[in-house]
Amino acid sequence: MPRVKRGVTAHARHKKVLKKAKGYYGARKNVYRVAVQAVTKAGQYAYRDRRQRKRQFRALWIVRINAAARQFGLSYSRMMDGLNKANVEIDRKVLADLAVHDITAFGQIAEKAKAALAA
């Protein structure tokens, strides 16, 4: 069985990690042992934050809808209850976008929610 020298594969592996660590500060960008830790931790943060991003955007949409709904005399929860009763199926992302960019359309939707709550 011939002897396998792993210089080529080790170099390729090091190069791959150091390429991912490009732009990092200090030893993290050019010392393999430190770069491995930094890249691994970055991957953990990325994995966690891809999930957190969904929660954070939903929270942002709710804040925007609540602020706009209060201009029309409704709280967020009353607005959503009214929309459910009126069978209006607009998701929070679209509602928040309307609240920011087209307040008149949002106002019409808010009036529908109010009417459904009164009925």
Curated annotation (Swiss-Prot):
InterPro entries: Ribosomal_bL20, RIBOSOMAL_L20_CS, Ribosomal_protein_bL20_C. GO terms for molecular function: rRNA binding; structural constituent of ribosome. This is Large ribosomal subunit protein bL20. GO terms for biological process: ribosomal large subunit assembly; translation. Belongs to the bacterial ribosomal protein bL20 family. The gene is rplT. HAMAP family: Ribosomal_bL20. GO terms for cellular component: ribonucleoprotein complex; ribosome. Keywords: Ribonucleoprotein, Ribosomal protein, RNA-binding, rRNA-binding. The keyword Membrane does not apply. Binds directly to 23S ribosomal RNA and is necessary for the in vitro assembly process of the 50S ribosomal subunit. It is not involved in the protein synthesizing functions of that subunit. The lineage of its organism: Bacteria, Pseudomonadati, Pseudomonadota, Gammaproteobacteria, Chromatiales.
